[in-house]
């Protein structure tokens, strides 16, 4: 590559990292937006490893923002298991429910991941347009919900329903955070509990998918050839995810989810008409 090509390659990956970083934490579907950008501008990453790298960047942002919750859950789970501290039971059960909610998406990913990818590849933008409208309708349903359940009130049923919703979100255009938030709030969770459950649930899912892709990363020649653009995308996605999640947490506190429904309707309709 010459200097000019190197520059535009870096810009290219910067844009992809920015799109991933902004759209991953908020309920508008990061995978759907990547497909839209690919169709509009011909922007597409080379190599199977890119998606894993930017997902890890978003994961790092989530880990930093929820670090206190993670430490508390880990410590109290340890105390409940090995010290039989009854006051730590609710945190231990919260971890159990996170594990339960992870199982459905793991099953769907392992059994049907390739089939879903092939189906989406045939007419990706049409699927994204339709699923963005579905996401909008789901968000609209919960715009005024104010549940009462906190972490100690959750049940196995809650975990399974949220887990099934997350499994549905493997389809591009169905937001993972949106699907899990909608399911959580329909099950009666308070907004802050639903938000915490949704993003703590992202951790095992992202880690699991990344671990499964390690062999592909090792074999992928693009990792060595494009390590600088990949690094740019990683840093960009991390910074964008961090601030996007902080912003979204503030939006949730003020109950303004309806604006994401408006956005998904507008983008979904435009995609169906023009792409």
Swiss-Prot record:
Write down the EC number.
Answer: 3.6.1.27
User: What Gene Ontology terms for biological process does this UniProt record contain?
Assistant: cell wall organization; peptidoglycan biosynthetic process; regulation of cell shape; response to antibiotic
Q: Which GO terms describe its molecular function?
A: undecaprenyl-diphosphatase activity
Top-level EC class as recorded in UniProt: hydrolase
The family assignment reads: Belongs to the UppP family.
Cellular compartment(s): Cell membrane
Please state what the protein is called: Undecaprenyl-diphosphatase
Q: HAMAP family this protein is in? A: Undec_diphosphatase
Keyword tags: Antibiotic resistance, Cell membrane, Cell shape, Cell wall biogenesis/degradation, Hydrolase, Membrane, Peptidoglycan synthesis, Transmembrane, Transmembrane helix
- State the superkingdom: Bacteria
Please give the organism.
Oceanobacillus iheyensis (strain DSM 14371 / CIP 107618 / JCM 11309 / KCTC 3954 / HTE831)
Q: Which InterPro entries match?
A: UppP (IPR003824)
């Amino acid at each position: 590559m010459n200097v000019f090509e190197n520059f535009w390659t870096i810009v290219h990956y910067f844009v992809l990292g920015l799109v991933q970083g902004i759209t991953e934490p908020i309920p508008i579907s990061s995978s759907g937006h990547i497909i839209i950008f690919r169709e509009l501008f011909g922007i597409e990453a080379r190599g199977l490893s890119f998606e894993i790298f930017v997902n890890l960047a978003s994961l790092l942002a989530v880990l930093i923002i929820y670090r206190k919750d993670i430490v508390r859950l880990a410590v109290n789970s340890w105390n409940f298991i090995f010290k039989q501290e009854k006051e730590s039971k609710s945190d231990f059960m919260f971890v159990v429910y996170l594990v339960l909610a992870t199982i459905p998406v793991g099953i769907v990913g392992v059994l049907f991941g390739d089939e879903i990818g092939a189906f989406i590849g045939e007419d990706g933008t049409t699927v994204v347009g339709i699923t963005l409208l579905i996401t909008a309708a789901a968000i609209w349903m919960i715009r005024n919900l104010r549940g009462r359940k906190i972490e100690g009130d959750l049940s196995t049923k809650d975990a399974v329903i949220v887990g099934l919703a997350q499994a549905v979100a493997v389809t591009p255009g169905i937001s993972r955070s949106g699907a899990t938030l909608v399911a959580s709030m329909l099950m009666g969770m308070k907004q802050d509990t639903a938000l915490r459950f949704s993003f703590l649930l992202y951790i095992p899912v992202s880690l699991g998918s990344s671990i499964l892709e390690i062999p592909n990363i090792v074999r992928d020649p693009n990792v060595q050839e494009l390590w600088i653009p990949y690094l740019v995308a990683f840093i960009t996605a991390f910074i964008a995810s961090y601030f996007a999640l902080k912003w979204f947490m503030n939006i949730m506190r003020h109950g303004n989810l309806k604006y994401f429904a408006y956005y998904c309707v507008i983008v979904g309709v435009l995609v169906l008409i023009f792409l």
